[in-house]
Amino acid sequence: MFYNREVKPLSDTWGVSGKITVNAILNSLDDVAMQHAELTGDDVLERSKNAVNWVMTGWDIRILNLPKNNEEYKIKTWVNSNIGALSSTREFLLMDTAGNPCVKAQAYISILDLVRNRPVRFSDTDLARYQPEPDTVIEAPVKKIAAPKEFIAEKTLVVRRSDIDFNEHVHNTTYLTLAMEVLPEELYKEQNFQAIRINFKKALVLDDVATIKLAQTEQGYVVAIYKE
């Protein structure tokens, strides 16, 4: 099942470059995924009360052209039918109003036992309700990124209440916001990103002290977030 949604940018989604920020794009993708879940009757809040819920274990994002502040766009999403025992991918295609691709993304999804902090196997209905499709937006996914041994900058922040979601963890899109804190100023302002790969290992929670470290490699910048 493909789910489509039109999005009208709000003023808090614009960056100083006049483009929609990648943080806002990621939030839009996440919002549309939640709307798709509601359409299928998959109540994530009820799942959270039962201490077993969907989590995203990573993002692979390819940026072709960020929409400008006055440009509406549409998002198409679906669950991929290439399903493992413990994980699958949710596909996203962000397009301008003419249907031209602007952003392609994959979210790696699993179901987590929130008490034991361990993934659990999908049930017969977990993914079937989404009527998975074989289409994929990224033919050559980026492998997980190893943390560098040497860093060129770092910043320490404390996790706030506003960073926490209904699972009582830092929300998955907020980690990109944290990573932006150590990027070079010009890159942050201009938003000249071509690809972003996010790996999640362990969730941050309220009042955690997070050290955000920046490294530069031949492929680009790498940000690692450590819990003190």
Language-model features: locations:
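Hot-dog-fold acyl-thioester-processing enzymes
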Residues: 1-56, 100-106, 113-194
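HotDog/MaoC-like acyl-thioester-processing domains
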Residues: 3-4, 60-144, 200-206, 215-228
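Structured core of small recognition/catalytic domains
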Residues: 166-228
